[in-house]
Amino acid sequence: MIYVICYDWASTSGNHTGMRYLYEYIQKSNPELYKMYTFNMGRRFLDKGKRGKQISVFFTALKLAMTYKSGDKFILTEYLHRDSYQILFAKIIRFICPKAPIYAMVHLVPEKLERRYSKAQIKKSSRFVTEIVTLGSSLTCYLNNLGIENVYT
């Protein structure tokens, strides 16, 4: 099973521009292979506050780690987006299932990444995932220049 962890952002909810739409399409085309977990980033999720969001992500990761089977994979669609807590998710999966393949999509521009994380934090976060996937070669080059080698466009 490939577990896709994505977010339904208010700005792209219900239209074809968001990651959720993309992965829903992929899941519908192959439901026996893909299982999607969506965090709704609308008012209810935002009202939970930082701790509430972390708890939601923690228990989802714990549930998936406890049901992990050899051959399962994880795709994180908003890695390094501070509000998604996907670094926490990856840490939990990596701790409980050290051999689980975790693929993380990063699609924020370097300026936004640097506003949220130090370069050392960005580099450290790469250790929790198997591979980082970007949507452009300039972001791949930026991450490579930080010393992160497991990045692919």
Model-derived segments and spans:
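A short, glycine/small-residue-rich beta-strand->loop->alpha-helix junction that serves as a flexible
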Residues: I5-Y21, H81-D83
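Helix N-cap/beta->alpha junction signal
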Residues: D8, E78-L80, L108, G136-S138
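A short, Lys/Arg-enriched amphipathic alpha-helix followed by its capping loop at the start of a domain
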Residues: Y21-Y34
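A short, charged, and often flexible helix/loop element on the N-terminal side
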Residues: Y37-K63, L76-S84
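Short N-terminal targeting/anchoring amphipathic segment
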Residues: K63-Y85, P101-Y103, E131
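Structural alpha-helical scaffold elements that stabilize or flank donor/cofactor-binding regions
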Residues: T67, I122-S125
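A short, histidine- and acid-enriched strand-loop-helix "catalytic/donor-clamping" loop
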Residues: H81-R82, A100-R116
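A short, active-site helix/loop in glycosyltransferases that binds the activated sugar's phosphate group
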Residues: R115, F128-N150
